[in-house]
Amino acid sequence: MNHSLRTAIDIDAPASVVWDVLVDLGAYADWNPFIVSADGSLAAGEQLTNRLEPPGGRAMTFKPTITELTEGRVLEWLGRAGIPGIFDGPHRFELTDVDGRTRLEHSEAFFGILVPFMRKSLDTHTLKGFEAMNAALRERAEARVRTTS
């Protein structure tokens, strides 16, 4: 049983600026409407503590493990509910340069026996959370570019 969410947004800022906003976990409370807090060390194998507040959904705290960190390009973590195979999801942020702008691809693939029961919530609340985070990240990165120009 699996299901995926994929979103993308173009940002009028260099990838280095977008990356700096994305990996400044301590500032999430200042701008991020979806992952309202995040704490931990950014290194492959390290565990984070994230608090999600999906629009219209139930808030939750989870402890994903960073599975990929490519400086300036990719941040991916694996979250799971309890034991493997119940409800697992690699959550991925990938930055690509596009003609002086940055494309953020924000996605998650969900696996496990609970996925069929969670699909409606994923397609509504979680997807809206991804989109809200993307828009807020764009706003914050573009504001940084404006203040340094």
Language model regions located:
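Hydrophobic ligand-binding cavity/cleft-lining segments
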Residues: 1-43
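Residue-level detector of alpha-helix boundaries and kinks
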Residues: 3, 51, 80, 118-122
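Hydrophobic-ligand binding "helix-grip"
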Residues: 29, 39, 55-103, 109-112, ...
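Secreted/surface-exposed cysteine- and glycine-rich disulfide frameworks
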Residues: 45-50
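A conserved amphipathic terminal alpha-helix motif
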Residues: 103, 109-149
